[in-house]
């Protein structure tokens, strides 16, 4: 079962439809999940607040090897903190998310990614849909980057953690392929 984290915001319906997952904030269902998806929309602080009762089980599941896919805010919540506001994320990466100096990154853009199972069958140069104002700087966790006012991290994969800054559920066939690839992980 794929648990799609319900933190009181986010684009849950299209992710649920694409992955045939279960939208939940129930710690028991999350604990029983084979995979976890944290879809993204909303603010860092609101997400931190929205997961306060399930934060520990999410961290435990990820640490124990459960495949995790973070989408947009689901990538951002992996970090310690954000310029967006107060609160402590899941802290898998001890970095502070930054705010773009010039507006919001909204629209279609490419991802320069290393070969990875999650991008299997997706051509380099494909476009994905982005909408975000905050970003993860480049770091040792960066497996894919995108250019908007400079390069930022748009794809992370370390062990069982997969995270994308774009919205695959809004990115047409390449995005749906990425979601299928995640769903097919052993």
Swiss-Prot record:
Where is this protein found?
Cytoplasm
- Domain of life, per UniProt, equals Archaea
Which biological pathway? Amino-acid biosynthesis; L-histidine biosynthesis; L-histidine from 5-phospho-alpha-D-ribose 1-diphosphate: step 5/9
Question: What chemistry does it catalyse, as a reaction equation?
Answer: 5-[(5-phospho-1-deoxy-D-ribulos-1-ylimino)methylamino]-1-(5-phospho-beta-D-ribosyl)imidazole-4-carboxamide + L-glutamine = D-erythro-1-(imidazol-4-yl)glycerol 3-phosphate + 5-amino-1-(5-phospho-beta-D-ribosyl)imidazole-4-carboxamide + L-glutamate + H(+); L-glutamine + H2O = L-glutamate + NH4(+)
Catalytic residues at: 72 (nucleophile), 167, 169
Question: Could you cite one Gene Ontology molecular function of this protein?
Answer: lyase activity
Taking the record's annotation, the residue ranges forming a coiled coil are none
Answer whether the UniProt record assigns the keyword Cytoplasm to this protein: yes
Please report a single Pfam family linked to this protein.
Answer: GATase
What range(s) does the Glutamine amidotransferase type-1 domain occupy? 1-186
Quick check: keyword Transit peptide in the entry? no
What Gene Ontology biological process does one annotation of this record name? L-histidine biosynthetic process
Q: What is its EC number?
A: 4.3.2.10, 3.5.1.2
What does this protein do, in the record's words? IGPS catalyzes the conversion of PRFAR and glutamine to IGP, AICAR and glutamate. The HisH subunit catalyzes the hydrolysis of glutamine to glutamate and ammonia as part of the synthesis of IGP and AICAR. The resulting ammonia molecule is channeled to the active site of HisF.
**By what name is this protein known?**
Imidazole glycerol phosphate synthase subunit HisH
Q: Which organism is it from?
A: Picrophilus torridus (strain ATCC 700027 / DSM 9790 / JCM 10055 / NBRC 100828 / KAW 2/3)
């Amino acid at each position: 079962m794929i648990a799609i984290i319900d933190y009181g915001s986010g684009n849950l319906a299209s992710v649920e439809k694409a992955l045939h997952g279960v939208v939940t904030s129930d710690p028991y269902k999350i604990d029983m999940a084979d995979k976890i998806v944290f879809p993204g929309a909303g603010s860092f602080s609101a997400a931190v607040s929205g997961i306060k009762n399930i934060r520990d089980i999410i961290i435990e599941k990820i640490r124990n090897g459960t495949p995790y896919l973070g989408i947009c805010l689901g990538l951002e919540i992996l970090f310690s903190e954000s310029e967006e506001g107060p609160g402590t994320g899941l802290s898998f990466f001890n970095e502070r998310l930054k705010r773009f100096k010039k507006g919001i990154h909204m629209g279609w853009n490419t991802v320069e990614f290393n070969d990875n199972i999650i991008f299997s069958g997706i051509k380099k140069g494909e476009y994905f849909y982005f909408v975000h104002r905050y970003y993860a700087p480049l770091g040792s966790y960066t497996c894919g980057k995108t250019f908007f006012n400079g390069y930022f991290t748009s794809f992370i994969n370390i062990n069982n953690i997969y995270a994308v800054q774009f919205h695959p559920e809004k990115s047409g066939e390449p995005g749906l392929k990425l979601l299928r690839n995640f769903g097919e992980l052993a």
